[in-house]
């Protein structure tokens, strides 16, 4: 197995320079796993060292760990088509041009401003989201938005009668035996904290994302908590294609551009990682606002799990983004060089 010494060095430097409190990480090479952790899980109001088996607020990793798989399973079962319109399942949405494919590839062009969005009760937020509109980017640009995956969750609920977070639990977490992963942690102390908020105080064991906080189990864009080792199980299931949450017909397609124009670097939820060298690769990845990221190479059966709480104690911590991208670049280079 590759030693990944440069990637680990860069992770430790990230912590030592105070960019993040700590990092839990894992490298996957087929059935081999190398994992570790470094740093703290909490700085304020008091210091706590990072421990094994802690739950991380995955933020937008919820989209690809959960919602994407539920949607593709419904398509595979014949309950849904990628060409189906949003309007067909949510009649309150007036526009008839936006399809499931647009939503799952972030090419819907849905836009608009909702005043006081983070202070609305769930029903008001639901109605306000359905009153947004399609802008000029429709189908022409990939513009990442939580709204696309909130709507996908509502589509899945309209079909099954079950809220999206329960569907993710039943269709992904339980079959993969991701036994620690949950949308409702029972004990805050087993969770890595996120922001120290002016309005909410220390956010720990409760979802950080404001829309997910309001919508609760009806949010398909964020809300999942998971341990590093559960995410290793998730990645290995996809890489080995054993009990994969991605249905067989979509296994090959998941590393291909699925946008309507076929040129926007997005698969079903996943972002595609461009690679400029000659090594065979099928790299997909996704990140979460709280400081999380996962990478998969379907050609080489390798994966990377990176979990931090970059919004602790303060958000947004913009310098983190370039450093995270550099760590992923180091990882990709290191695994290819070794290969």
Regions found by a protein language model. Give the residues of each.
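Short, P/G- and charge-enriched loop/turn segments at secondary-structure junctions
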Residues: 12-15, 55, 138, 256, ...
């Amino acid at each position: 197995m590759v030693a990944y010494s440069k990637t680990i060095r860069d992770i430790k430097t990230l912590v030592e320079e105070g960019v993040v409190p700590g990092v839990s990480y894992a490298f996957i090479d087929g059935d081999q796993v190398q994992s570790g952790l470094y740093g703290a899980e909490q700085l304020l109001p008091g210091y706590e060292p990072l421990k094994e088996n802690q739950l991380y607020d995955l933020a937008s990793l919820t989209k690809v760990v959960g919602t994407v798989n539920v949607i593709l399973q419904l398509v595979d079962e014949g309950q849904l088509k990628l060409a189906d319109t949003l309007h067909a399942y949510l009649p309150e949405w007036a526009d008839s041009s936006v399809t499931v494919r647009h939503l799952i590839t972030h090419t819907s062009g849905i836009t608009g401003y909702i005043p006081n969005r983070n202070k609305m009760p769930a029903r008001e937020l639901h109605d306000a989201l359905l009153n947004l509109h399609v802008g000029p980017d429709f189908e022409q640009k990939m513009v990442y938005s939580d709204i696309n995956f909130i709507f996908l969750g509502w589509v899945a609920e309209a079909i099954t009668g079950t809220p999206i977070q329960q569907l993710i639990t039943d269709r992904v977490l339980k079959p993969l035996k991701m036994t620690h992963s949950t949308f409702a942690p029972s004990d805050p102390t087993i969770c890595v904290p996120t922001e120290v908020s002016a309005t909410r105080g220390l956010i720990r064991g409760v979802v950080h994302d404001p829309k997910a906080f309001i919508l609760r189990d009806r949010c398909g864009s964020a809300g999942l908590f998971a341990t590093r080792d559960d995410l290793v199980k998730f990645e290995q299931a996809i890489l080995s294609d054993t009990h994969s949450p991605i249905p067989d017909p979509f296994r090959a397609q998941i590393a291909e551009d699925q946008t309507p124009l076929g040129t926007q670097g997005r698969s079903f939820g996943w972002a595609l990682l461009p690679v400029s060298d000659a090594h065979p690769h099928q790299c997909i990845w996704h990140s979460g606002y709280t400081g999380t990221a996962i990478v998969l190479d379907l050609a080489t059966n390798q994966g990377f799990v990176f979990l931090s709480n970059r919004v602790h104690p303060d958000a947004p911590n913009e310098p983190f983004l370039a450093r995270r991208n550099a760590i992923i670049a180091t990882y990709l280079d290191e695994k290819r060089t070794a290969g």
